[in-house]
Regions:
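Short, acidic, small-residue-rich periplasmic hinge/interaction motif at the N-terminus
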Residues: 20-62, 102, 586
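Short loop/turn motifs that connect adjacent beta-strands in outer-membrane beta-barrel proteins
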Residues: 28, 164-169, 193-196, 232-234, ...
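Extracytoplasmic beta-strand/coil segments of soluble accessory domains associated
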Residues: 71-113
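Short acidic/polar hinge/loop motifs at secondary-structure boundaries
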Residues: 113-141, 160
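Transmembrane beta-barrel wall of Gram-negative outer-membrane proteins
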Residues: 176-207, 212-251, 255-296, 335-342, ...
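Structural signature of Gram-negative outer-membrane beta-barrels, strongest in the C-terminal barrel
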Residues: 419, 425-427, 452-596, 632-634, ...
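Gram-negative outer-membrane beta-barrel transporters
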Residues: 476-480, 593-595, 615-727, 812-814
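C-terminal beta-signal and adjacent terminal beta-strands/loops
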Residues: 639, 720-724, 746-815
Length: 815
């Protein structure tokens, strides 16, 4: 009923708006020019010496009808990977550029930082259908130009909001497809009122059952804007809200449980399970250990049916009802007040005040966990009062309340010789982390702990100040040569205190005890950049050198496990590129060498809520070549492609591995310390090993047919092998994969019935039904008493797969 009301309201507003409309283009030149002023501070200047990919408004609007998150559109550009937990591209999704994950990618909206200050990542599940609100995106690979917020260590994503239309109009859309996935939405603009004022709004929502069991969810966004515009000045208020309740699968698809791995070779077994496809073939392709567990027989062995498929069953609460699912619940509201002024033909300026409030929590069922892992304050909770019980089921609620506010300001000067931008950004973050146990299956423990209906087991506060100032200038040396220089100073102060959500194992007391956080870290970073560019006719060439620094993120302090305290990292990025374009064909190549000091690299491990964990390595690098090409075969048929070929290495790497046996009397064991669970650690050294999650080849090919109202796009992508840790071990890796998608659209004018046009679309994904995983995690250990030496470790892999063939149809009505 609520969805029907929303759609009716959107349709009504659109119809009222069209009654006032004129037959004219809705996006005026002056609005576009003023929007360029707003984003100028973070977008690469024309002819600046950096590698970029631009995504236009039309592509963004078409993509918005799929319900997928933005990373899946970005993955069509060179060197970019995307994946999502539920297998469909909706909800919890992730992004990598040149092998660097979300927390290393700077993201802004109209120059305002979007990265979570503590985690330094953008949570794309909280940005569902954002593409419908955008007028353009620029992806800068490498360090790129100076920006606001966290340092770019793989790339920068600069989002530009869609300019409000000066002509009244609107649209509504509906999409439906596989796994009961549907997207509804609409947008409207009042057009220009009283020659100066525009009110516009939008609402979009995506629902899905999810491919992976227990990942059904609902997420969406809403937008309301008020714009005052004059010929050279505009002031605009944007309120963008996001909501989500999405089923989680951060454990991914696993071969077994916490105690037993079904991966081939563990404990000497020959299961034949090495890849995600192998799991799919034994009935575990959609298995989610956050939602269900293996079925056991009377002897404690896994049950299989007549076809050899492993059987699973839902978790059950004390009242006999099945546990619904593990969910991520989050609400976020962005408020941005921006002003832009074209002062004269040389000078322009823009300023934005921003405030974001967010609140949310995970809710998760923990099956048969050790009671002492709750970090309880007294030994009595592990004694006779519990009837000797050592394990219990429990539900935890881990949450965050946060407020972020700040100012972004830019001043720009441009004449025939100079293009200069000065920028200032200050931002303050205040957050509170909390965790409650809301259910315990052990009656005695519930009576002792949950006197008020729940038990708070951690609480901590956090504050982070982030400020930067920069100036960048492009100087036209001649008609064909430009010089570029960019200097940025950035100051960061991060504080947190209180109890962590992780507990420390006390070997003497055989208990887990609370871990108190007391962090006060300050960083001062100087980030210079310089380069040259050449342009003549269709030829363009550039070379640049850029330095960037980045502070550790929150989980580097709270989840660093076996590794020493985290350090800030730095990156020296060398880039060189050439491109040539004619009216019919175009081609380009970019060479890069990214040299890291103390890079925080992914270890293949994850936190207990699915965050990828990282650790410092002293010397590492990423180097490669990125190729693009396109040819217009006819006016209605185009072939395009891009390729990213790379080498990603750690020069010297020390790995710490759990040893389940007692190594106290073994002189050959290079012990480091205990891991917090009472297991000893062994240290192994590697030279020139491949960085985790860094495929050596990412390829994309497109065939685009467009004739009158018809459009069809064929897209085939290929990703080479990815190692899940930094040891370059093939057993702990994801095989290469290739997928093909087809998108079809037809635009039908319907002005005779009061509709500007109707757009019908069909999106066909993975048409050859490939069974593959595009991300994952790994755990490995040594247990020589069970035959698991370092060369033959016990290991468990969590595979993050994509669904097989899926389809979605859509219809959009524009007024």
């Amino acid at each position: 009923m609520n969805k029907k009301i929303v759609m009716a309201a959107l349709l009504g507003m659109s119809v009222m708006a069209v009654n006032a409309a004129n037959e004219a283009d809705g996006d005026s030149l002056r609005m576009e020019q003023l929007q360029e002023v707003v984003v100028k501070g973070v977008w690469v200047q024309k002819n600046a010496p950096f590698a970029v990919a631009n995504i236009k408004k039309d592509e963004l609007q078409k993509f918005s009808k799929t319900g997928k998150e933005l990373p899946f559109l970005f993955s069509q550009t060179p060197g970019v990977l995307a994946w999502g937990e539920n297998g469909l591209g909706t909800g919890t999704s992730y992004l990598r550029i040149r092998g660097a994950g979300d927390s290393r990618i700077n993201v802004t909206l109209d120059g305002v930082p979007l990265n979570s200050p503590e985690d330094q990542a953008v949570f794309w599940a909280n940005m569902n259908s954002y593409s419908s609100l955008l007028g353009g995106v620029q992806i800068q690979r490498g360090v790129g130009t100076s920006t606001n917020g966290d340092g770019a260590f793989g790339g920068t994503v600069a989002l530009s909001s869609k300019t409000p239309s000066e002509k009244a109009g609107g649209e509504v859309n509906f999409s439906y497809g596989s796994y009961n996935t549907f997207n509804v939405g609409g947008a409207f603009s009042t057009g220009l009122l009283w020659n100066h004022l525009i009110f516009d709004g939008a609402y979009h929502e995506t629902n899905t059952d999810g491919y992976i069991h227990g990942t059904s969810g609902r997420s969406g966004s809403y937008y309301g804007g008020l714009t005052w515009i004059d010929d050279k000045f505009t002031i605009r208020y944007k309120n963008i809200g996001n909501f989500e309740k999405t089923g989680q699968a951060w454990n991914a698809v696993t071969a077994g449980n916490d105690d037993l791995s079904l991966m081939d070779g563990t404990y000497g077994s020959k299961t034949g399970i090495k890849t995600y496809k192998d799991l799919y073939d034994v009935g575990l392709g959609r298995y989610n250990s956050l939602y269900e567990h293996f079925t056991y027989d009377a002897d404690g062995k896994f049950v299989r049916d007549a076809n050899g498929n492993y059987q699973t069953e839902r978790y059950v609460m004390n009242n006999g009802e099945p546990w619904d699912k593990t969910t991520d619940n989050f609400w976020q509201n962005h408020n941005i007040l921006s002003a832009a002024w074209n002062i004269n033909e040389n000078w322009s300026t823009t300023a934005s005040l921003h405030y974001t409030h967010g609140y949310g929590y995970y809710k998760e069922f923990r099956y048969d966990n050790k009671i002492k892992k709750l970090g309880l304050p007294s030994p009595e909770f592990n004694g006779d009062a519990l009837g000797g019980a050592k394990r219990t089921d429990w539900v935890r609620k881990k949450g965050l309340k946060q407020d972020t506010y700040g100012l972004v300001w830019n001043i720009n000067y441009k004449d025939n010789d100079w293009d200069v931008i000065g920028g200032l950004s200050v931002q303050q973050f205040d957050g509170n982390h909390f965790g409650y146990v809301t259910y315990l299956s052990n009656d005695a423990l519930r009576t002792l702990l949950m006197k008020n209906g729940d038990y708070q087991y951690y609480d901590s506060d956090a504050k982070k100040f982030d400020g930067n100032v920069f100036i960048k200038a492009l100087y036209h040396l001649t008609d064909n040569w430009d010089a570029f220089a960019d200097i940025q100073y950035r100051h960061v102060n991060y504080k947190t205190d209180g109890y962590n959500d992780k507990f420390i194992y006390d070997e003497d007391a055989y208990l887990y005890k609370k871990h108190y956080l007391d962090i006060n870290e300050k960083h001062n970073f100087f980030n210079p950049k310089a380069g040259f560019s050449f342009h003549n006719g269709g030829h363009r060439a550039f070379a640049s050198l850029a330095l960037s620094h980045r502070e550790p993120e929150r989980n580097n302090y709270t989840d660093n496990g076996n590794y020493p305290a985290p350090k800030a990292e730095s990156l020296l990025d060398y880039e060189m590129g050439y491109s040539y374009a004619t009216p019919k064909w175009r081609a380009g190549a970019t060479l890069y060498y990214m040299n890291y000091d103390n890079q925080l690299v992914q270890t293949g491990a994850k936190s207990d809520i699915g965050e990828p964990l990282t650790a410092n390595v002293k010397d590492s690098y990423r180097t490669g070549i990125e190729l693009t090409a396109g040819y217009d075969i006819t006016p209605w048929l185009t072939v395009e492609g891009n390729a990213a070929l790379s080498i990603n290495k750690i020069k010297d790497f020390d790995e710490f591995v759990e040893d389940w046996d007692d190594w106290k009397d073994n002189p050959d064991a290079a012990k480091y310390h205990c891991d917090g669970n009472g297991d000893e650690l062994r240290q192994f050294h590697y030279d020139n090993s491949t960085l985790a999650f860094s495929p050596s080849a990412i390829l994309n090919g497109f065939l685009n047919f467009h004739y009158k109202g018809w459009q069809a796009v064929w897209h085939t992508g290929y990703v080479s092998r990815q190692y899940l840790d930094n040891t370059e071990n093939k057993d702990r890796s994801l095989p290469a994969y290739s997928t093909t998608n087809v998108n079809l659209n037809y635009t039908l004018p319907l002005k005779a019935i009061g509709v500007k046009e109707a757009i019908f679309g069909v999106n066909l994904s993975n048409i050859f039904n490939a069974r593959y995983a595009n991300s994952g995690w790994v755990y490995s250990a040594i247990a020589e008493s069970y035959g698991h030496t370092n060369d033959n470790r016990y290991y468990q892999i969590g595979f993050v797969p994509s669904a097989g063939f899926t389809a979605m149809g859509s219809i959009t009505l524009r007024f």
